[in-house]
UniProtKB/Swiss-Prot annotation:
It is found in: Cytoplasm. GO terms for cellular component: cytoplasm. Its main location: cytoplasm. The gene is argS. GO terms for biological process: arginyl-tRNA aminoacylation. Transmembrane segments: none annotated. InterPro entries: Arg-tRNA-ligase (IPR001278), Arg-tRNA-synth_N (IPR005148), Arg-tRNA-synth_N_sf (IPR036695), ArgRS_core (IPR035684), DALR_anticod-bd (IPR008909), Rossmann-like_a/b/a_fold (IPR014729), tRNAsynth_Ia_anticodon-bd (IPR009080). HAMAP family: Arg_tRNA_synth. Belongs to the class-I aminoacyl-tRNA synthetase family. This is Arginine--tRNA ligase. Its EC number is 6.1.1.19. One of its GO terms (molecular function) is arginine-tRNA ligase activity. Keywords: Aminoacyl-tRNA synthetase, ATP-binding, Cytoplasm, Ligase, Nucleotide-binding, Protein biosynthesis.
Amino acid sequence: MELLIKQISAFVEDVFEQKGYDKKYGMVTVSDRPDLCQFQCNGALPAAKEYKKAPIQIANDLLPALKNVEIFEEITIAGPGFININVKDSFLAAYVNEMYGSEKLGLEEPAEPQTIIIDYGGANVAKPLHVGHLRAAIIGESLKRISRFVGHKVIGDVHLGDWGLQMGMVISELRRRSPHLPYFDESYEGEYPAEAPFTIDELEDIYPAASKLAKSDAAAMEEAQQATAELQKGRRGYMALWQHILNVSVADLKKGYGNLNVDFDLWNGESDCQKYIDVMVDYLKKNNYTSFSDGLLIVDVAKETDNHVIPPFIVLKTDGSSLYSTTDLATIWERVQDYDPDQIIYVVDKRQELHFEQVFRCAKKTKIAGEDLTLKFLGFGTMNGKDGKPFKTREGGVMRLQDLIQIIKDAVYNKLQENEAIDPSEVDEISRKVGLAALKYGDLSNQITKDYVFDIDRFASFEGNTGPYILYTIVRIKSILRRIAAEGFQASDKIGVPHSDVERSLLLKLSRFNETVEFSFVNHSPNRICDYIYDLANTFNKFYHDTKIISETEFEKKSSWINLITLTMNVLETCLELLGIEAPEKM
């Protein structure tokens, strides 16, 4: 179904056209003064310049015809020529009823669905997830869900760091600890063990030990570099060992991301694009895109219009080996070959902006990415502690993600234990859901590009613009519906016209659901959904306090209210689903 705001705009545009004005001036927006009106059209002001008339004259020209539009309850002119609009309750109720009867709450499918790849996650194998992985994971997951809900084909790719020097470090450290393993015997020709010679806990101890040693011992660094080179040349034992590292790590990462309610369609990594690098480099050379600078193979990506220096894109190092930039470009090559996407969106730390600017420019200049392919960098800000610095443990180290999740779960658990109405056996699971909502909502309610402060007391609060408050509102509605069901009341399937200002306000808020989702998709802004559901929850709670739903004796009125709060619950839960948040049945 068409957006409510577009339907209203169409009527106003027709009136502009009827009166001899360009219809483009008839665009309607939601009123920024809801105390004065529901919607407004400011088109008379810009039209005044074109038609050499005062805005108030244009607005008055339109007024009689606007008052005759069947869906409008009231039209007034304010200030220099603002057109204030209130719609009829019957029109509003009809729109909301159509939402109520629709599987996707009235959202229109796109005429031409796109294929969109979202690159988020970015975890490294052999390392545990830490707080630095939080934002990419939950922002990317939300964008994936929003895009998919809107109707596009969306592919989420974790893009693991599973290649390069870190692998050589791990292999070298394993060799020092267990030199007897067959993976290190170049004369070994048998089958390698199916089971990895280490657990995830051992693996997570091996990498930091190897990294620390390599930084302080030149010989150890040389060993790691040699192991990396042999792995990348396909040494049989090292490849088998690398596969073990990958398998053990991915199993643990899936568990870690699962605890965040995050999943991926592709578990690809840097290693997956390696087979494309030689072909890609040959293509770049044959088409004269490359040159040499101080032994480096580069592509010049600077433009005359640049107001700051954009360094050349490095394809290969002096020894002919690849870099992160090479694998990122080869990954675009791979994705174009395999999926022919319309968009590739990268959800990464905003401090990587220059790197991706170089990658995107190179991909476009060399035609690896065609004109129709949109490459989008979505750089996110930092999660900081109360001191304004990147969030750390008390000891100053990087906190594991599972520890952060546990901290906020415990904070919620302590609050829920005070509620004697909750079965003690359910408190743990409810705490998990509410804690995760507190964490994810606290993050997603901020603009992606902004830094924010992780404030556990504020995030876990059951009041204000928080995840627990939204969940509590949903649980309140579920409780009402359970009580009504226990009465045996059978409601009709219709939402009637509103009986009060707050009920009308609730219908208006519900009618903005599709507009909000579409805006969030186009602008990559989950925070807009957070703003919307906080506003909707507040409006519902005012309606709840002012309306005696359960004790109402008039059938049609009670039925309408039951359907209205059911739709409110469905909209809230759908929005939470788009944010990757689950709602419990009780709190």
